[in-house]
UniProtKB/Swiss-Prot annotation:
The protein's name in its UniProt record: MICOS complex subunit MIC12
Gene: AIM5
One Gene Ontology cellular component: mitochondrial crista junction
Transmembrane segments: 7-24
Gene Ontology biological-process entries: cristae formation
Function noted in UniProt: Component of the MICOS complex, a large protein complex of the mitochondrial inner membrane that plays crucial roles in the maintenance of crista junctions, inner membrane architecture, and formation of contact sites to the outer membrane.
Length: 97
């Protein structure tokens, strides 16, 4: 009985793989494969390696600059402490309402 179950499961998996291969690569002249992102990237990389594809260098845009201000850690801790004190006071006074 167990050999029959193993044979059936192997046959089912093989049939599923064969059907998916057929529909992905063969059916409609490989439409899904030809339009897949993976193939497009592979073709572009192969073109760069062969030298037939031009590499356009990207220039960083200056319009998206982010200004970072570094504050001392003591100021950050003071802000956190003050926020906790305010939250505690609000919680305490909310009991009387």
């Amino acid at each position: 009985m167990s050999k029959l179950i193993k044979l059936t499961s192997i046959t089912a998996v093989s049939s599923t793989l064969a059907a998916s291969y057929y529909f992905y690569f063969v059916d409609r002249d490989g439409f899904h494969y030809q339009n897949s992102q993976w193939k497009k990237i592979g073709d572009k990389v192969q073109g760069i390696i062969d030298g037939s594809e031009n590499i356009n260098p990207s220039t960083p845009s200056n319009s998206n600059q982010v200004i970072v201000v570094k504050r001392p850690m003591t100021e950050t801790m003071k802000d956190l402490w003050n926020e906790q004190i305010r939250n505690t006071a609000n919680w305490f006074y909310s009991w009387g309402k």
